[in-house]
């Protein structure tokens, strides 16, 4: 049987050659568990006449990836094979690749179609010796297989459909795209990114150095006007933003409700639902950057709006299709007054913004005064018990995970932009809280630090974290100036306020590396100190930039200009890790260059590239699927797998148990308690702890955070108590998604069917819902009246005799 080599020559398939190639890439791996011969045997069995060496390499990489559940080193080997394969197909020298990308001619039109901007091309050519020699290609081999495949699929630039960049080329392109002629800063950024200390957000990785460098992730839009012109002008603006890979949060509080009078036509309004359906179709049509990811809009509405009950139905899977818009995401911008009325079981009045103007433009006591004034003047459309509205919110969340919950008064009260005006909404992922208006589209550029990379010899290196965050802050500040803005309103806003968003990834991995169970005192302290370090470093860097470039335009009158920082607004004292008094003196003297700095975002794609868990989330499972173009691969939490291999507990039987138990190790008797404590999944961690951690880091987050809530068996009582707990803790984002576990598990492959049947019988019993009646727990397969009566204190009560009924404290 013959194989085609890269130069087109034919050669006989040689078992030994394949084994030797795989063996060469096994350096530093555990030779007791990683077997090159076994991989070669599986590759040979898939060979067909005329196969190319590129296809052989792909097959070898995927074969190694399927064996990851045997030992975590197989994931590293799979990546090495895939990276080595790419290296053989691409140019080595960075400046040569930049030249190829810049000089590209579209074969269909025969016209130049450069993928690198003239400015960046000129800089690279001018400094090519320095830039070419700074790149260390071995760092490509530090990615795991799935991280590398994510890069290959969406991030590395292509010529005629073939990948032209290596990961190191992409990182250097991003560094030069941000820093331009400042080669020293570009190489510093390259080194930190290539060593996995931090990463910029996806749009920055996609577009830096290209002719249209749209590097921002988030845009916050306010409707231009409640008119056909205003609605469609705003729609066009959203399309232009989405076209260049921006996610959008749009507030629609000021759009008149169904049945409102329209003076221009002497007719009545159809309300927000038909309008949202138009926006929904735009989100579907305008994808982000040539199918890299679909367009995404989140609509924000305050709960006093007369159409809010229809708004809550829009994402549901059943009902009249004319009243559904499922590609949009939905969020509530909730004033404290609404929460208070739900808690006190009082009436809630709905208004049309055309008949009761100005409610979206005020917050706090001013909002309460205006809302109650309109109530007294009988301007309301109708009123309902606030708890009935609350029930509709919960029902929608259980069915769809939406609407997101953000607390308007906390977002405004604790914002460094409160001197600019009332903040009307957040973004698509609920972590950006910035001022927007009809003539200002708020923008945010994001980056995240990889928390596990700062662990050395079992200790957390806060000084290194501080140093790296200062570099990232300077980068994000530079992006504001080099960025391409899809609409002028975005440029105006970003130049006036200069906000940036620093986030994290891999907090759960950092806990694993330091052997800290998620709910331990050590983890609680580390969570606070990490975010305190990030906030301090970002402020210090921003202050140092202000010394040279001056403060941002709207600085005067901001809380920071009066010596008030985020933790002051929370009435919290920081730890003694950093000298805050000295920093406040510096800020009083020089000011800061950026109005906002810290915003932990979901990091869904970039954390997959670096091989860490998302943002600050616990692991959702110790066994999960990773999908690449060639198929799905089963992955075991690499930290757990390493521990089980070291303790000689990992075998096929253990793997089957893990699959059978949905990635949980709590019911596996052979696994010792210290590992059970360390590797609890998010479903096994008290959500009260998750909310506590969010509140603990809140004083050092001047924007907000993408906080998901996970509930295994959601009941209206549990969700209610969580929302109220988060609201009373002072969170700005009370909830991003509500994540619930499917009642029926997916099909379990490679599992002993007898064992599975026994497990399913047990879980059927467990899934019956516990309900409290007259202080006693009863089991019911159906939700009862008491369970739906979310305001009945007994349902919310915590009972030591009935721990399963309360998920807030895990009893």
From Swiss-Prot:
Residues annotated for ATP binding in this entry: 5-6, 11-17, 53, 57
Residues the UniProt record annotates as site (Important for hydrogen atom transfer): 218, 444
InterPro entries per the UniProt record, alphabetical: ATP-cone_dom, NrdE_NrdA_C, RNR_lg_C, RNR_lsu_N, RNR_R1-su_N, Rrm1
Activity modulation comment: Under complex allosteric control mediated by deoxynucleoside triphosphates and ATP binding to separate specificity and activation sites on the large subunit. The type of nucleotide bound at the specificity site determines substrate preference. It seems probable that ATP makes the enzyme reduce CDP and UDP, dGTP favors ADP reduction and dTTP favors GDP reduction. Stimulated by ATP and inhibited by dATP binding to the activity site.
Keywords tagged on the record: Allosteric enzyme, ATP-binding, Deoxyribonucleotide synthesis, Disulfide bond, Nucleotide-binding, Oxidoreductase
GO cellular component, one term: cytoplasm
A Pfam family the protein falls into: Ribonuc_red_lgC
Catalytic activity, as annotated: a 2'-deoxyribonucleoside 5'-diphosphate + [thioredoxin]-disulfide + H2O = a ribonucleoside 5'-diphosphate + [thioredoxin]-dithiol
Residues annotated to bind dTTP: 226-228, 243, 256, 263-264
GO annotation terms (biological process): CDP metabolic process; dCDP biosynthetic process; deoxyribonucleotide biosynthetic process; dTTP biosynthetic process
Feature type site, description Important for electron transfer: 736-737
Residue ranges constituting the ATP-cone domain according to the UniProt record: 1-92
Function field: Provides the precursors necessary for DNA synthesis. Catalyzes the biosynthesis of deoxyribonucleotides from the corresponding ribonucleotides.
Family: Belongs to the ribonucleoside diphosphate reductase large chain family.
Protein name stated in the entry: Ribonucleoside-diphosphate reductase large chain
Originating species: Schizosaccharomyces pombe (strain 972 / ATCC 24843)
Taxonomic lineage: Eukaryota, Fungi, Dikarya, Ascomycota, Taphrinomycotina
